[in-house]
Amino acid sequence: MDERLLSGESGYEDADLEYSLRPQTLRQYIGQDKAKHNLEVFIEAAKMREETLDHVLLYGPPGLGKTTLANIIANEMGVNIRTTSGPAIERPGDLAAVLTALQPGDVLFIDEIHRLHRSIEEVLYPAMEDFCLDIVIGKGPSARSVRLDLPPFTLVGATTRAGALSAPLRDRFGVLSRLEYYTVDQLSAIVERTAEVFEVEIDSLAALEIARRARGTPRIANRLLRRVRDFAQVRSDGTIAMEITQMALELLQVDKLGLDHIDHKLLLGIIEKFRGGPVGLETVSATIGEESHTIEDVYEPYLLQIGFLQRTPRGRIVTPLAYEHFGMEMPKV
């Protein structure tokens, strides 16, 4: 997959920045009002009852703040957080080691929880339901099962693919919160806050321009801000003004709706070779040289969100809005 400025996935540079910018409380957290207000109630109720919070599943596109919310949940509950990921837990023993190290009330955060192997999920079921762990000691006829008690804990799972979770695992979460794309105003506030942390002056119109092209995603907004800051320092006086912002974003090939060269390649490929569709996913994959799951999980969600692409039983169809964006006429049927 091409290196992509507009990917919602986290890179090493993003991780360092996000840690320094991460809000510590729900009150400081910008956006996701519905999820935030619900979590506020659930956390307060759990604290009033002196209980652990129900297990929480956070799902939605990458870059919307799932890891940040997991850390805030632990902070609001006044407990420690232990972080791991689905791909990092390769064997049941790996999960057992993590679970037995938890202290009472701790939050266990599993990112990409949809990538847990089914055999590991089965170990997780009694841990989530009964706070116990069934482990097998020995092999063959002499093998025996031993049940270990675990301290009460809260599992917070994060996934970009809620549908990929098995039903038994999904049903064991008491709180399910879908994170939505951010509004331009919310992203603009995030950009201005990040600029303040960077100690760089930014024009409010420039912050709005970055926000408009950030695909509804804070991680992308902050990444664009970093790149625009570079242009402002090298090609201007260091202040992020509207003119330098527009110039930088054009040079970075990020158009006014936040589409980049890969989006253009996908949409124009369907328009020019298949008269706008419908065309099957595998055919699109072969045409633009990208794996089908990458197209489905990474490229398409935003195009669907802004109404440039439709998924139908017959295949992908480019919409009139996309034709208009490219200044092209739709073919006559």
Curated annotation (Swiss-Prot):
Task of the protein: The RuvA-RuvB-RuvC complex processes Holliday junction (HJ) DNA during genetic recombination and DNA repair, while the RuvA-RuvB complex plays an important role in the rescue of blocked DNA replication forks via replication fork reversal (RFR). RuvA specifically binds to HJ cruciform DNA, conferring on it an open structure. The RuvB hexamer acts as an ATP-dependent pump, pulling dsDNA into and through the RuvAB complex. RuvB forms 2 homohexamers on either side of HJ DNA bound by 1 or 2 RuvA tetramers; 4 subunits per hexamer contact DNA at a time.
Alphabetical list of SMART domains matching this protein: AAA (SM00382)
Entry EC no(s): 3.6.4.-
Region (Large ATPase domain (RuvB-L)): 1-182
Name of the protein in question: Holliday junction branch migration complex subunit RuvB
Binding partners and assembly: Homohexamer. Forms an RuvA(8)-RuvB(12)-Holliday junction (HJ) complex. HJ DNA is sandwiched between 2 RuvA tetramers; dsDNA enters through RuvA and exits via RuvB. An RuvB hexamer assembles on each DNA strand where it exits the tetramer. Each RuvB hexamer is contacted by two RuvA subunits (via domain III) on 2 adjacent RuvB subunits; this complex drives branch migration. In the full resolvosome a probable DNA-RuvA(4)-RuvB(12)-RuvC(2) complex forms which resolves the HJ.
InterPro entries (UniProt xref): AAA+_ATPase, AAA_lid_4, DNA_helicase_Holl-junc_RuvB, P-loop_NTPase, RuvB-like_N, RuvB_C, WH-like_DNA-bd_sf, WH_DNA-bd_sf
GO biological process: DNA recombination; DNA repair
Keyword match DNA repair: yes
UniProt remark on domains: Has 3 domains, the large (RuvB-L) and small ATPase (RuvB-S) domains and the C-terminal head (RuvB-H) domain. The head domain binds DNA, while the ATPase domains jointly bind ATP, ADP or are empty depending on the state of the subunit in the translocation cycle. During a single DNA translocation step the structure of each domain remains the same, but their relative positions change.
Compartments, record wording: Cytoplasm
Segments of this protein annotated with the region Head domain (RuvB-H): 256-333
One Pfam entry name: RuvB_C
MF annotations from Gene Ontology: ATP binding; ATP hydrolysis activity; four-way junction DNA binding; four-way junction helicase activity
HAMAP family to which the protein is assigned, alphabetical: DNA_HJ_migration_RuvB (MF_00016)
Any GO CC annotation of this UniProt entry: Holliday junction resolvase complex
